[in-house]
Amino acid sequence: MNAVTDTPVTEMPAPFVFTDAAADKVKQLIEEEGNADLKLRVFVQGGGCSGFQYGFTFDEAVNEDDTVMNKSGVQLLIDSMSYQYLVGAEIDYKDDINGAQFVIKNPNATTTCGCGSSFSV
């Protein structure tokens, strides 16, 4: 309940899904790097055969315009420009017959390329 208005407070759903598999893999990679200050930054940039492509990197800094999500002790960072393209997306880690990789399932993508790392909206 909101103490000011006595109305129920509804929690907003998380803007992204950061799966347990992805968080566990990031945690493992951070431990291998030996730097507990690292966070996973997921971003969108121009390029690829469909117009935009996903990127992943480690970062120690949280920028003012970053959205931060915590999962299993791991921080996921998404900058404000990338946020608009990733709202509702699932960030996962798959290790199967096709190889091991981070995968983004993005409901905003209207087309994707065969490799899955490039998309258009």
Curated annotation (Swiss-Prot):
Residues that hold iron-sulfur cluster according to the record: C49, C113, C115
Pfam families linked: Fe-S_biosyn
UniProt xrefs under InterPro entries: FeS_biogenesis, FeS_cluster_insertion, FeS_cluster_insertion_CS, FeS_cluster_insertion_RrpA, HesB-like_dom_sf
Keyword Membrane annotated: no
An individual GO BP term: iron-sulfur cluster assembly
Sorted UniProt keywords: Iron, Iron-sulfur, Metal-binding
Function: Required for insertion of 4Fe-4S clusters.
Subunit note: Homodimer.
Name of this chain's protein: Putative iron-sulfur cluster insertion protein ErpA 1
Species this chain originates from: Paraburkholderia xenovorans (strain LB400)
Gene (UniProt): erpA1
